UniProtKB/Swiss-Prot annotation:
Localization in the cell: Cytoplasm; Secreted; Cell surface
Binding site for Mg(2+): 242, 286, 313
Main localization (coarse): cytoplasm
Binding-site residues for (2R)-2-phosphoglycerate, renumbered to this chain: 163, 338, 367-368, 389
BP terms from Gene Ontology: glycolytic process
PROSITE patterns the UniProt entry points to: ENOLASE
Gene designation per UniProt: eno
Protein name: Enolase
Annotated metabolic or biological route of this protein: Carbohydrate degradation; glycolysis; pyruvate from D-glyceraldehyde 3-phosphate: step 4/5
Length: 433
């Protein structure tokens, strides 16, 4: 019933109009699973390799026909007849076939598409939701959304150095209420920006991308929007940041090249984040320092690790080996989970499990180049991660994930759980913000 009879792939477009891989896996029982892979704009140096064609005559070199060919050729041949319900066997077969550390031969985009499609095919064959297949009876925790309502850095053409400013409705009682609060703040923010004379065009992830006067003003307009929407900053809706510091780190210095051109050392950046955490209702900072600035990360964790959530994205790249180094060195207290950073579902689940065993939280995340695929919504519930980062309340590629979570919440009914601030590694006093 679960034997793989056909593996097919095609080149489709992501939310930025760039090609990506979509795979379909057909089982002997008749079920078909389909999955599409996302891609990132600010990619970590240590991520698994996305295979691109490099043919400038097609899609400016970004085509993925080689990856598609690898799926329909080597991968399809290797997986034919295998039991798709044995996810780890499927993934290990593809890893062995690729034979590289970074999945660069077959392409992480080829491998991941098949890995996710296989899981979805089995869920479809069993006629159960994907989150239930992946998570069993424990799959009942709806995540707190990190809603990226203001964009800068590599995600926007403006003068804000930091990549993402997010609203987190940590005081809500349910996912649907949290989503409503976040959407209301997003729409209110549009009015705040318009009143100040700013453009309200949106960036890759659906957040606004105005040319603000400073990084501080980004925080200020969000706080104003939270209050205007009728909510209490900190107690009901807190702020999460993703500076993506690797993007402005060069030659051992952090260069604020988009704003005031100032340069900062690791120690000065730690002081910067400490000052902001004390001044504003910030509950989470992701990639506050560069991916290979391990000494700086240690300083940051010593300073803020027992107070707020410190998330490693480029630092860990969803890789259990890099996460193990962070755990051993007491660096960060949370990991961002992006399935295409590591390249298989099994390795993704391994990273989440390792984080959980060592007291780290896990935040399930999209990429800036997304598709309509809602796999990560089910993954968030299946793993009980408690947090999801999947953009703003605009752009269908982002909202698709939120809508899937609304459906899951409805399916779970009274069994649905929502942890709010309890989902984070946060030890501050929200009411005092």
């Amino acid at each position: 019933m679960f034997d793989i009879t056909l593996v097919h792939a095609r080149e489709i477009l992501d939310s930025r109009g760039n090609p990506t891989v979509e795979a379909e896996v057909t089982l002997s029982g008749g079920a078909v699973g389909r999955a599409a892979v996302p891609s990132g704009a600010s990619t970590g140096e240590h991520e698994a390799v996305e295979l691109r064609d490099g043919d400038n005559a097609r899609y400016l070199g970004k085509g993925v026909l080689k990856a598609v060919e690898n799926v329909e050729g080597e991968i399809a041949q290797a997986l034919g007849g295998m039991d798709a319900s044995q996810q780890r066997d499927i993934d290990m077969r593809m890893l062995d076939l690729d034979g590289t550390e970074n999945k660069g031969r077959l392409g992480a985009n080829a491998i991941l598409a098949v890995s996710m499609a296989s899981a979805r095919a089995v869920a479809n064959q069993l006629d159960i939701p994907l989150y239930r297949y992946l998570g069993g009876v424990n799959g009942n925790i709806l995540p707190v959304p990190m809603m990226n309502i203001l964009n800068g850095g590599a995600h926007a053409d403006n003068n804000v150095d930091f990549q993402e400013f997010m609203a987190m409705p940590v005081g809500a009682e349910s996912f649907s209420e949290a989503l409503r609060w976040g959407a209301e703040v997003f729409h209110t923010l549009k009015g705040v920006l318009k009143k100040r004379g700013y453009n309200t065009a949106v960036g890759d992830e659906g957040g606004f991308a105005p040319s603000l006067k400073s990084n501080v003003e980004a925080i200020e307009v969000i706080l104003e929007a939270i209050q205007q929407a009728g909510y209490t900053p900190g107690e009901q809706i807190a702020i999460a940041l993703d500076p993506a510091a690797s993007e402005f780190f060069k030659d051992g210095k952090y260069i604020f090249k988009k704003s005031d051109k100032s340069e900062k050392t690791s120690e000065q950046m730690v002081r910067w984040w400490s000052d902001w955490a004390n001044k504003y209702p910030i509950v989470s900072i992701e990639d506050g320092l560069a991916e290979d600035d391990w000494e700086g990360w240690k300083l940051l964790t010593d300073e803020l690790g027992d107070k707020i959530q410190l998330v490693g994205d480029d630092l860990f790249v969803t890789n259990p080996e890099r996460l193990a180094r962070g755990i051993d060195n007491g660096v960060a207290n949370s990991i961002l989970i992006k399935v295409n950073q590591i390249g298989t579902l099994s390795e993704t689940l391994d990273a989440i499990e390792m984080a959980r065993r060592n007291g780290y939280t896990a935040v399930i995340s999209h990429r800036s180049g997304e598709t309509e695929d809602t796999f990560i919504a089910d993954l968030a519930v299946a793993t009980g991660a408690g947090q999801i980062k999947t953009g703003s309340a605009s752009r269908t590629d982002r909202v698709a994930k939120y809508n899937q979570l609304l459906r899951i919440e409805e399916q779970l009914g009274a069994g649905a759980r929502f942890l709010g601030i309890g989902a984070l590694n946060y030890d501050g006093d929200l009411s005092a913000e």
